[in-house]
């Protein structure tokens, strides 16, 4: 199958904003895809090469890419760089370079999707001495044979800057449409395996029956079950039917651990493989998890010198560290508090009641200095739960989680079977979709940022306000450097950006607002932290903001409970 067909799909997707049309375009394309291509083409459609949980990365930035294109076309790298000032898009500039390339290959062959994918895999797997030169050569071979349109989208795939508006929800619907299967079965299979390639192949070859049989798989992370916020302990108990399990809500980073014999893999909430960053936790898990095979979930917490928990950003620093890991182990010691078990020795526990999963967790974990089972309390009494809540806060934790005793595990769902109780309104994780240049001494830096909430149905990010406070001068330098390559268009002092970067913000309140399509605006938002443990699709949704608005009004006594 020619790569040009995929490039033409990208072009059509980019030209329409209608979700149904995009879904139909992707579905029609998937129908034509050979069976042996289905495992990787869904990722290419998303503008990616590998699933989020795959450790492999291309490791190719703009300079390396331009070098490869210069080698393939005979056009000077500086000329390509200058062209970006006119086009505003490196993909467009590379397409122009390919269009007027000065050298032709006598052995040129049309690009196939399989060749492109296999070459990108080879690029990702090339490491060590001389790897940069090899990567340039592999990519140059592709651009040598590429049509201008192919070159444009190949460049965007390599840089991770595809702008076709295809998100997980749309791809899910397209798979269901293409192979005439139930969308809820596609959703379920994806939530259990986080692998669209696998799900698409099952949908085509085995239909609804095959999708219904999909189960948890070791080595493929399960989408995490999420919680809503409760107004109080009393409200949480009422929602849970009068009795609930309360456990400490730790201020850390959620992780999912897969054990297969002596092999341990740890995935972040974003489903990224963070195993190498936390070797001491991996070793402790080998001793702590008794079964041969298991999947458990917990919260990784950084511990200060006084034994109290540090803010979650310290854990993220551990995740980001690629070198001098032993040094970081001493500076930022970690502790893992486990709170759920989803799989044991070939048996999925997804459909098992929470109370039984908790008992199993306690049976299969041999606690040690680094690995604990989250402290909990099962009660019907508000007073007991409130005393536990007070103690959790005094210990430096965020608050409590309340869990329905008969709740099954619902991957990817943020329902009311799990509730969090905190002393303040929940902060929001939002995507930066635009920015405005500063003034005076900050004229060369972005001074404020336009915030977007995710709409999973359309894949869009809808504006909910602008944040300019809470940033240090160093923050603004870093954010400007990070965001400049993501500029899509400029309108005076305002720029619009590819929705890639997630930040955590606090705010005074959520207001209803006709000014924004989202219908909501944040009053006095303030920057708290960069959330590079989250991707754009992990950001808070419009629905979530609506829920928090209702909760806020309930707390103020304006809305009947």
From Swiss-Prot:
One of its GO terms (molecular function) is metal ion binding. Keywords: ATP-binding, Cell cycle, Cell division, DNA damage, DNA recombination, DNA repair, DNA replication, Ligase, Magnesium, Metal-binding, Nucleotide-binding. It holds the Pfam family DNA_ligase_A_N. Its EC number is 6.5.1.1. GO terms for biological process: cell division; DNA biosynthetic process; DNA recombination; DNA repair; lagging strand elongation. ATP binds at residues 247, 254, 269, 299, 339, 414, 420. The active site is at residue 249. Changing residue 534 to A: Reduced ATP binding and enzyme activity. The keyword Transferase does not apply. Gene3D superfamilies: DNA ligase, ATP-dependent, N-terminal domain, DNA ligase/mRNA capping enzyme, Nucleic acid-binding proteins. It catalyses: ATP + (deoxyribonucleotide)n-3'-hydroxyl + 5'-phospho-(deoxyribonucleotide)m = (deoxyribonucleotide)n+m + AMP + diphosphate. It is an enzyme of class 6 (ligase). Changing residue 531 to A: Reduced ATP binding and enzyme activity. Its cofactor is Mg(2+). It comes from the Archaea. Optimum temperature is about 70 degrees Celsius. Active from 4 to 100 degrees Celsius. Thermostable. Monomer. DNA ligase that seals nicks in double-stranded DNA during DNA replication, DNA recombination and DNA repair. This is DNA ligase. It comes from Pyrococcus furiosus (strain ATCC 43587 / DSM 3638 / JCM 8422 / Vc1). The gene is lig.
């Amino acid at each position: 199958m020619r790569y040009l067909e995929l490039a033409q799909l990208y072009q059509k997707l980019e030209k329409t904003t209608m979700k149904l049309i995009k879904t139909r375009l992707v579905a029609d394309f998937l129908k034509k895809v050979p069976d042996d291509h289905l495992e990787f083409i869904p990722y290419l459609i998303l503008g990616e090469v590998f699933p989020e949980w795959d450790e492999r990365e291309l490791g190719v930035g703009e300079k390396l890419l331009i070098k490869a294109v210069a080698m393939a076309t005979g056009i000077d790298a500086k000329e390509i760089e200058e062209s970006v000032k006119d086009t505003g898009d490196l993909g467009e500039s590379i397409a122009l370079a390919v269009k007027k390339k000065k050298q032709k290959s006598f052995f040129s062959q049309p690009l196939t999707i399989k060749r492109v994918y296999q070459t990108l895999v080879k690029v990702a797997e090339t490491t060590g001495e001389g790897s940069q030169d090899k990567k340039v050569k592999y990519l140059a071979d592709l651009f040598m044979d590429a049509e201008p349109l192919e070159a444009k989208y190949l460049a965007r795939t390599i840089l991770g800057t595809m702008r076709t508006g295809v998100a997980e929800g749309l791809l899910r619907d397209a798979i269901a449409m293409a192979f005439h299967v139930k969308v809820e079965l596609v959703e379920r299979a994806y939530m259990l395996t986080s692998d669209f390639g696998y799900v698409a192949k099952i949908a085509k070859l085995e239909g609804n029956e095959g999708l219904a049989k999909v189960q948890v798989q070791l080595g493929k992370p399960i989408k995490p079950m999420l919680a809503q916020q409760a107004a109080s302990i009393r409200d949480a108990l009422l929602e849970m039917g009068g009795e609930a399990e309360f456990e400490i809500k730790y201020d850390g980073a959620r992780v999912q651990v897969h054990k297969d014999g002596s092999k341990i893999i740890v995935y972040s909430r974003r489903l990224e493989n963070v195993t190498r960053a936390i070797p001491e936790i991996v070793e402790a898990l080998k001793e702590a998890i008794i079964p041969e095979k298991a999947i458990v979930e917990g919260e990784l917490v950084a511990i200060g010198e006084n034994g109290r928990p540090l803010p979650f950003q310290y854990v993220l620093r551990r995740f980001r560290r690629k070198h001098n890991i032993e040094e970081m182990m001493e500076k930022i010691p970690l502790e893992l508090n486990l709170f759920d078990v989803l799989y044991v020795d070939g048996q999925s526990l997804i459909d098992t009641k929470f109370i039984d999963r908790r008992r199993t967790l306690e049976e299969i974990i041999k606690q040690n200095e680094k690995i604990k089972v989250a402290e909990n309390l099962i009660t019907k009494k508000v007073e007991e739960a409130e005393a536990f809540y007070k103690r959790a806060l005094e210990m430096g934790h965020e608050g409590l989680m309340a869990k329905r005793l008969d709740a099954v595990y619902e991957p990817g769902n943020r329902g009311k079977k799990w509730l969090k109780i905190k002393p303040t309104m929940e902060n929001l994780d939002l995507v930066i979709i635009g920015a405005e240049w500063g003034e005076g001494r900050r004229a060369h830096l972005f001074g404020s940022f336009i915030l977007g909430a995710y709409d999973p149905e359309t894949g869009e990010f809808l504006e909910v306000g602008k944040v300019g406070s809470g940033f240090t001068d160093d923050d603004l330098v870093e954010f400007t450097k990070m965001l400049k390559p993501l500029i899509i268009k400029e309108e005076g002092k305002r720029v619009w950006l590819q929705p890639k970067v997630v930040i955590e913000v606090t705010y005074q309140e959520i207001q209803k607002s006709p000014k924004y399509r989202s219908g909501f605006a944040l009053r006095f938002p303030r920057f708290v932290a960069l959330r590079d443990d989250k991707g754009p699709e992990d950001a808070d949704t419009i629905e979530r903001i609506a829920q928090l608005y209702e909760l806020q009004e309930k707390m103020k006594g304006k809305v009947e409970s």
